[in-house]
Amino acid sequence: MDLLATTSAAAVSSYALLSTIYKSVQALYAQPAINSSLDNLGQAEVVVPAVDVIVPCFNENPNTLAECLESIASQDYAGKMQVYVVDDGSANRDVVAPVHRIYASDPRFSFILLANNVGKRKAQIAAIRSSSGDLVLNVDSDTILAADVVTKLVLKMHDPGIGAAMGQLIASNRNQTWLTRLIDMEYWLACNEERAAQARFGAVMCCCGPCAMYRRSALALLLDQYEAQFFRGKPSDFGEDRHLTILMLKAGFRTEYVPDAIAATVVPHSLRPYLRQQLRWARSTFRDTFLAWRLLPELDGYLTLDVIGQNLGPLLLAISSLAALAQLLIDGSIPWWTGLTIAAMTTVRCCVAALRARELRFIGFSLHTPINICLLLPLKAYALCTLSNSDWLSRKVTDMPTEEGKQPVILHPNAGRSPAGVGGRLLLFVRRRYRSLHRAWRRRRVFPVAIVRLSTNKWSADDSGRKPSVIRARVGCRRPVAPRH
């Protein structure tokens, strides 16, 4: 049994050494630059490129979709902005139809209705090929943008060498359950440690899908590769954000992170959907890691350490945990060294995160360690053994129809008209009424909510079986800007 104890101690010691080096260097590079290009650009840059915002949605809750679209409509961007909402063959179009009607007369909004569910990637591509802006912002349909997100991402994209940039993600439903609180802290660490350090070298390895901006000229070069991703002869239908980011880096473009472009997204509130999400992400990470390895010689040495730390670290932790468990079950002896080392590493990381974020709640992130060891590490092992499986686990994807009668339906607004209808007029009234909340929202980063009642006689039951009678719409806290043509 000495072999098990030695294996466990050696693996956990190696894990501690690797993690200490990796996290220390990461924390050093993750510190914000003293003179950021964003600060300098705010005074010098005057070019305002056209931006196309793409919102793919599939069976989205109407309340959530309304909040997303209203946050986009309330952007303070000074340039031209067009919004393309892509309904990816949703079965609940009758339910979301009132949300569409709110923006049906806004010349900035267009709706692309796909006949069948073809997946997020092809839904994005349908909108990209229907649009023409200089920059393309992808926004998930369950994401709410702060009012200045488009402006700040555009400022970062002023350098033609930058192909993509992402904003900081937070959990909009953070206070819902203990799990959503953990995920919110996980997002903060992923953005402000991992992405921030990678951005120091212009090589963010994954510009997250909920809020990522791309340069159209770069997309034009990569769109065919992006659309036709295959793994072991099978089409890959998830992990589109990571794959597109890797393609950008492979083509020689830089990828950046903008920490003050805040986007709040809905995160899983229970373990089952969370584990399904983590399984998809693990598969896409392993697939694209093979591509990332080929890029490392062309990137800074830190990126090599980053890839090694993210892949070898979990492996060492898994080996030490398995050996410690076997030692406990077979020999009956407690693996003190392994347990104390993991506990010490967890405590130090959580304390450092609490100091950097200036929030004591990060001490509670220590709860993530047992979840990682007991659930996520076995899940990653399963993902590695099932890399060829491209199932979303939550929906089925079909091929894009090619028959003439089943082409995507694009509903363009009637240009020159202001939002009409009871819902549209009421929404504009609510915008004007709550201007004063803008300063409070900016101080506390709270998204004000207004209730918008839509007069309609036809509703379909939502997921809970109840007939919705209210749509909650996020409202901007400034006067609506006149539509730009």
UniProtKB/Swiss-Prot annotation:
Statement: the UniProt record of this protein carries the keyword Membrane: yes
Membrane topology field: Peripheral membrane protein
Gene: nodC
Pfam families documented for this protein: Chitin_synth_2 (PF03142), Glycos_transf_2 (PF00535)
GO annotation, cellular component aspect: plasma membrane
Cell membrane listed as a keyword: yes
InterPro entries assigned: Chitooligosach_Synthase_NodC (IPR026463), Glyco_trans_2-like (IPR001173), Nucleotide-diphossugar_trans (IPR029044)
EC number: 2.4.1.-
Biological role stated in the UniProt entry: May be involved in the synthesis of NodRm-1, a sulfated N-acyl-beta-1,4-tetrasaccharide of N-acetylglucosamine which initiates a series of events in the host plant species leading eventually to nodulation.
Family statement drawn from the similarity comment of this UniProt entry: Belongs to the NodC/HAS family.
Protein name according to UniProt: N-acetylglucosaminyltransferase
Enzyme class: transferase
Subcellular location: Cell membrane
Single Gene Ontology MF annotation: hyaluronan synthase activity
Keywords, ordered alphabetically: Cell membrane, Glycosyltransferase, Membrane, Nodulation, Transferase
Organism: Bradyrhizobium diazoefficiens (strain JCM 10833 / BCRC 13528 / IAM 13628 / NBRC 14792 / USDA 110)
Principal location: membrane
Cross-referenced NCBIfam families: nodulat_NodC
UniProt-listed GO biological process terms: extracellular matrix assembly; hyaluronan biosynthetic process; polysaccharide biosynthetic process
